[in-house]
Amino acid sequence: MAIEIGIFHNGASDLKAVTTPNGVVVNDGSLEEVHRSYQRVLVGQVRQGILADRLGYDYWFMTEHHFMPEGPEFSPSPLLTEAAIASQTKRIRFGQMANILPWWHPLRVAEQAAMLDVISGGRLEFGIGRGYQPREAETWGWRYGSTIQDQERNRAYFEEAFEIIMKAWTQPSFSHHGEYWSLPPRHTKWNHKATMAYFNMAKAGRRVEDVLKVGAPDMYSVGSPIMASTTTLKEISVFPQPVQKPHPQVWEPVTSERSIRWAARNKVNAFTVPEPTSRLKRNIEIYYEEAEKNGWPDRLNRGRWKFGWDAEKHRGFGCCRYVHILRPGHEREDLQRYKEPIELQWDYYGPFGFAAVLSDLGEPMYDLNMKVTADLIMQKEIAIVGTADEVVDKIMHIKERGGYDDFMFTAWFEAGGYSTEEIEEQMQVFASEVMPTLRHACGGGPMLLESTSQFVPERGLAGVAGS
């Protein structure tokens, strides 16, 4: 057995949470103060990612969220933030929960994610999602027709974008002509002598006729020689490709059975946050049932993997929970302070339908308009709060109820109103008082390879003043 331990970061504002007269918890600050808060949060995310590596955490996961004055989350570019962390770390692996594919041009996210894999020395865990908040989805997705107000269209767009990214990462050159994307566009004129010279070389590995549809001169065209022809592009190459082959492991945050089954069929690890422990094992069973039915899909074709999580094969169903460790002698005070930030999160999430998934297995679905209290979140074991020993016991209880062989657990420390220093203190206490006990109880941790990437030109700086 083994346990892998990560950190999930959603970027909540560090401004104090306040309960408004109508009972809704929000940021307590002006828009200008929220802007400054998120600047501090961004720097804190980089600091905490570097600290996580030094404390021995295995994974660092970030969300993608935009345009949020209410305060519960901020993470506009997880790939960019993680690239900053990657340049200062050696071991920790970088995931996104998730890159929201309907908000991106698929080749743009393919390039940027591959860049993170290269910069980190092969430490990318590529997370993908569909999005659910209309303020973000309609603002970003309008250009690509990926509205969430038509769920089937959104899903179809997501699946096509995923297919394109996999082609870009695994084929030396490729084309794609689907419902939403034509890549390269069939009308693209490209009569370039350098392209023809390159693909006429045998070592290129592709021929001119593979990548170009060579045509006659266009007597009616004006402009450059590239356009003065009927020669058009047939295929393109995306650079860079990831270091990991055939591609990095892909992840998806899941709640619905349909998403769980799609992930299992498509070699994608599942990741869950807002569901009670009573539902966890059934969702894992659905994932494994679908995987077995489809011949254990895996990017490296390694066959069956252990139930729940397989640390050696890096496959399965990850579990994430809020975690807050109470200080000895300050338990009541710390617990009371923690409740309001949790309700800030859930006053925001609830209206999107997340309240519905809080019901236990076999229990009627909750009213989407219900007030989700911090006490309910703790009762459902979505938030693990207590002394260090109590946190260990609660995490092990979740592992046992989920039926895990190996275990993949991700802790969510940050919450609205907590400073960077307070979040770092939680990380440090967990690493020193919780993590060793979990590692011992679960048979140790993973053997993660260290990056050999070198970003400081030491030879070039020799003798330079201030170096």
For each of these PLM feature ranges, what is it?
Residues 59-79, 100, 274-277, 410-423:
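Glycine-rich, proline-tolerant flexible connector loops at the mouths of alpha/beta enzymes
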Residues 64, 85, 116, 126, ...:
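Conserved, mostly hydrophobic/aromatic
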Residues 1-88, 247-248, 449-454, 461-466:
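N-terminal beta1-alpha1-beta2 module of alpha/beta enzyme domains
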Residues 3-9, 60-62, 93-96, 124-128, ...:
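Hydrophobic faces of well-ordered beta-strands that scaffold small-molecule active sites
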Residues 53-54, 82-91, 113, 117-123, ...:
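Acidic (Asp/Glu)-rich catalytic clusters
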